[in-house]
Each structure stands twice: as structure tokens, then as C-alpha cells.
Amino acid sequence: MRVYPSFFCHHHLFFYGFVFSRKELFMIFIDMDGVIANHVRDDYIGENPKFLQPHYFASCEPNPTIIAFVHLLQEFQIPYLFLSRVSPPLNYRESTMDKCKWLFEFVPGSNVIFTQDSKVQTAQHWLGRNLQADDILIDDFNPNLEEWENAGATAIKFLNGNNSPDTWHRTASNITELIECYNHHGSHIN
């Protein structure tokens, strides 16, 4: 697989990382906020929540479970992308640059797509095809999971300590559960 460092920007879509074949048989998409970066509930509360402050993401702690899972994906050369929605009122450019720096520090060599649009539409646009059952999204937010499954793909709810396992049928909170979910819907990590 040939890879090239690149920037890709189209409409409200920004990609940074290494380009590889978009015709992959399947793809794993991983959310950032509340999945690879720990979610702190208090940071989202109040009139002037902390998450709206400049460079907030730089202070987020990495989730060791997802870091370990990404290292497995890298070891087995399983295609994955981080897919992060950056919504107003956040400063789009500042937020995306902070997240790129954060990924470079904690999981170098990772690819990321930022969008202000639907994660499904963004993934389909990037892949150049409709989502299919083997395309997996690991996210912590039910509306993203619902939209993903409604598009015919597989959604895994990552339990981060702030969300409920009772509101989704396919969940994972540790490396073993993530591997089991992946093995059930993708190829296999042994």
C-alpha cells in the first residue's frame, strides 16, 4: 500500500494524514471527543463551558483503551481513520489544528477527517461509495451511531463512563470488547 502525506480539503471537510486506497473493502472510523480523548462532563456545562476555550483539546487526556486498540490496528495494518465533527461555535481551524497536534503526540501516523457535516455523508464522500456493513464507527454519541447504522454500516458505542450502555445494542468499554466487536464484523485480530 503506497501512502503519501497529504492535506485534503473540500467544502466543510478537512483531511490530514497519509492517503491510502479509498477502495478498501472496509474501514474503521473512530471518533475523537469522548472516545480516544477522555470526556470530562463538567467541561461541557455552564454559561462559558471549558470546551469552548481556545486550545481546549490540547489538555484532553488520552483514553488508554482506544490508544491500545489503535496500536493493534496499526500492527495488523487494518485501515482506520479518525472522524471528528467540529461544530460551531468552535473555531474550526483552531480546533482541527489542535486535534492534529494531539493525534501526532499520542498516535503518530494516524489519519483524520474533520467535518462540520454528517459523519455518514463525510465517510461516504471520502470513500467514494456508500457505507456497508463492514464499515465500523466507534463513537460515544447515540445520534451518530443511529445515523451510521441507518446507512447500513456497523456502529459500536464506546462506553466512556459518562454515557449509558442501556441505550445502544452494541457496546465496548475495554480492549477485549472492542476486539470482539471488530472480529464479529470485520476481519480478525488474533
Question: What are these regions, as identified by a protein language model?
Answer:
Residues 59-63, 78-90, 111-114, 156:
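Short, well-structured secondary-structure segments
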Residues 25-60:
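Active-site neighborhood of HAD-like aspartate-dependent phosphohydrolases
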Residues 136-171:
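Acidic, Mg2+-coordinating phosphoryl-transfer loop and its flanking beta/alpha structural elements
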Residues 66-96, 103:
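Substrate-recognition element of Asp-dependent hydrolases with the DxDx(T/V) motif
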Residues 7-26:
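Short, Lys/Arg-enriched N-terminal segments with co-localized hydrophobic residues
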Residues 115-148:
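Conserved Lys-Pro-Asp/Glu-containing loop-to-beta segment of HAD-superfamily phosphomonoesterases
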Residues 161-190:
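Charged phosphate-binding loop/patch that engages nucleotide di/tri-phosphates or the phosphate backbone
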